[in-house]
């Protein structure tokens, strides 16, 4: 069995707001904890939905890079939104921009609330492409 590597801090990505790893890598798979659109300067959710999704994309890219991968290696996602009808179009546009022809699988769920009154949180699973920089 392969070793399990846990990442708790990634430069440029806000720290977790609780006791969990930012990412866990096992057997070439990268499991990334839910990312929200947190402004690293304030520690709070960014202003607009688009700004939150941009932050999620930035934090995802940094996390993948730290693990020797990139956006094209994302194979599965789970999206949590607090308003399906209002947020699904923005999430769809985000997916087209972020993943292009490399669309991962996706589950999208509406939830009653998220931490810090946020509106979107996304978990990711990716495949490692090369040895990580950890």
Residue ranges and their predicted role:
Residues 1-58, 62-75, 81-134:
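N-terminal presequence-like segments and the immediate start of the first folded domain
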């Amino acid at each position: 069995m392969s070793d399990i590597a846990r990442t708790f801090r990634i430069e440029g990505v806000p720290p977790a707001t609780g006791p969990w790893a930012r990412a866990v890598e096992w057997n070439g798979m990268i499991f990334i904890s839910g990312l929200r659109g947190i402004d690293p300067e304030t520690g709070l959710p960014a202003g607009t939905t688009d700004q939150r999704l941009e932050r999620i994309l930035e934090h995802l890219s940094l996390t993948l890079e730290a693990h020797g991968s990139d956006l094209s290696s994302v194979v599965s996602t789970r999206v949590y939104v607090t308003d399906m009808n209002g947020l699904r179009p923005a999430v769809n546009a985000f997916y087209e921009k972020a993943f292009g022809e490399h669309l991962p699988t996706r589950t999208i769920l509406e939830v009653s609330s998220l931490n810090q009154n946020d509106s979107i949180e996304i978990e990711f699973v990716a495949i490692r492409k090369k040895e990580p920089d950890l």
